[in-house]
Design a protein with these regions (language model features):
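Conserved beta-ketoacyl condensing-enzyme motif
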Residues: 1-11, 173-193
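Condensing-enzyme catalytic core mediating Claisen C-C bond formation in acyl metabolism
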Residues: 13-20, 24, 44, 54-58, ...
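Stable alpha-helical structural segments in soluble proteins, enriched in small hydrophobic residues
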Residues: 108, 153, 157-166, 186-194
Length: 209
C-alpha cells in the first residue's frame, strides 16, 4: 500500500455490448433483478401494490426534476407522475420511468490533506469525517438467511460510517444523502438501509412528502 498527499479517484462507467449469457447468472436482467427486490420488499412488509407503485413514481418524478436542474445531466426532462404511473411495464412492478437510462460518464474527486486543501484557495471544500465500504460477491442470494428485501452491504457500511462519524440518529443529523438510483425501488429500499426511514416505512415517508 502507498500513501499520497493528494489523490484523484475517478469513476467512469461504460456500458458495452454483450450477450445475455455473458453473466454470473445467465439470462438475468437488471430490471428483473430489481423487480424481485420490489416483490420481496412488498411481500415482507405487506405493502399494497398501488402504494408501492405510487411511492416509486414519486421518487422517479423527483429524480427527473433534479436532473432537469443539472446542465450536465444525461436526461433533463421533467416527467408528470401520471406519465410514470402509466408507463409501459418493463419488469413488474417496474415501469419504463422506474428504470434508469444507459449512460457513459465519469466523475472524480480530489482528496488531499487539510493543509494542502487550505492552500488551494477554494471555499467549497468538505471534510471527510467517515469513510466505509462493504462489498459482496452476491452469494447471499443463495442462502435463506437473506430474504432479498434489502441491501445487506448498505446496512453494514452505513452502520460503520455512522459509528465512525459519531452519528446516533441519521434521520435527524444527516441533511443530504446521494444514493444510487438505478431503479426507483433502489432509493426506496436504501432509505431504510441507511436508517432514514424505519423498516417498512419508506413508502409512507415518501407519500407523506
Amino acid at each position: 500500500y502507498r500513501a499520497a498527499h493528494c489523490a484523484r479517484p475517478k469513476l467512469g462507467p461504460q456500458r458495452g455490448r454483450g450477450t445475455l449469457n455473458n453473466m454470473t447468472w445467465p439470462n438475468a436482467s437488471a430490471p428483473g433483478s430489481f423487480a424481485q427486490l420490489a416483490a420481496a420488499y412488498r411481500a415482507k412488509h405487506g405493502s399494497a401494490p398501488q402504494d408501492l407503485k405510487r411511492a416509486m413514481a414519486h421518487i422517479s418524478v423527483k429524480s427527473h426534476d433534479n436532473g432537469a436542474k443539472n446542465p450536465k445531466a444525461h436526461l433533463r426532462n421533467k416527467i408528470p407522475i401520471d406519465t410514470v404511473m402509466n408507463s409501459p411495464m418493463i419488469a413488474e412492478p417496474l415501469g419504463l420511468y422506474d428504470c434508469c437510462g444507459v449512460s457513459d460518464g465519469s466523475a472524480c474527486a480530489i482528496v488531499t490533506t487539510p493543509e494542502i486543501a487550505k492552500s488551494l484557495g477554494k471555499n467549497d471544500l468538505i471534510t471527510v469525517k467517515a469513510l466505509q465500504l462493504a462489498v459482496s460477491n452476491g452469494l447471499e442470494a443463495q442462502h435463506n438467511s437473506w430474504d432479498g428485501s434489502y441491501f445487506a452491504t448498505t446496512r453494514i457500511a452505513s452502520k460503520r460510517a455512522y459509528e465512525e462519524a459519531g452519528i446516533r440518529n441519521p434521520r435527524e443529523e444527516v441533511n443530504l444523502i446521494e444514493v444510487h438510483d438505478c431503479f426507483s425501488v433502489t432509493e426506496l429500499v436504501t432509505m431504510e438501509d441507511l436508517h432514514i426511514s424505519a423498516e417498512g416505512r419508506a413508502i409512507h415517508d415518501v407519500l407523506d412528502g
